[in-house]
Amino acid sequence: PIRSSAASDVYKRQIKNRGSLFSLSGEDQNITKGRLVIEELFSFADQSKDISPKEIHFFISKALNQPNESRNFKLESKSAFSLTTPKLEVIPRNQSQEDFINSISSHDISFGIGPAGTGKTYLAVAVAVNLFIQRKINKIILTRPLVEAGERLGFLPGDLAQKVDPYLQPLYDALNEMLGFETVNKFIERGNIELAPLAYMRGRTLNDAFLILDEAQNCTSMQMKMFLTRLGFNSKAVVTGDVTQIDLPSKKMSGLADAVKILEGQKGISFFHFASKDVVRHNLVQSIIEAYEKNSKNNED
């Protein structure tokens, strides 16, 4: 027998298989969810798609978020739509991700707020790349506030690329997955893709562009205003961040938290809030986030 450690550990059951036949033992509600996970994985494989640990964890997480009393639920393994990029097809992994993409599509300025692992920035990059390859925009601009350097890059050793790259690496990673390393570098050289610290956005008006501000909780209110007012004709801006992970000095107001108070409800601007249940990374990531949230609430009480 082969023990499926990922599913077995999560559901506290034994899973055995012989070829394509599986047997499950444990509590009834866990067996029901485990059966549906296995069925969805078979369905996923039937679509000629490779099953990686990422897919397994996704389906397990999806099942765990279903009510225990639900006996005949259906996991939503396939979204109604996907985002095509040159290297891969980006499919929303839960309803929140699909709603966030719809929010970006229907608003010129969109905020995605929530914990790490919910796919906020990755989805924003996917939408940007999708629009770029359709030639609906001419430029993708990705930026982050450089809190550790205080945005004073002159105090860091090396040229601009050497100084900035470590801070922007997560954005590079997403672009490389969707476009490929050589293509990303080609478009950077041509000026079609730009990755820069937030301070370098000052004084510009950006037309026919898709702007993404990542880690926005670490920009100041003035920086947030500066970024949002860079928006030109036929442009979109997406702001992502987590208001529980602010690294600014205690006396400085987070530009993201301030924007929620000032702009939420403003026509043409959307605010989408992710929850810990929307995390699509390793199951432990969701558990860790929830544990810290619980501890934070206890400290407040």
Residue ranges and their predicted role:
Residues 16-77:
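Interdomain "pre-motor" coupling segment immediately N-terminal to P-loop NTPase/helicase cores
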Residues 85-213, 217-301:
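Conserved helicase motor core of SF1/SF2 NTP-dependent helicases
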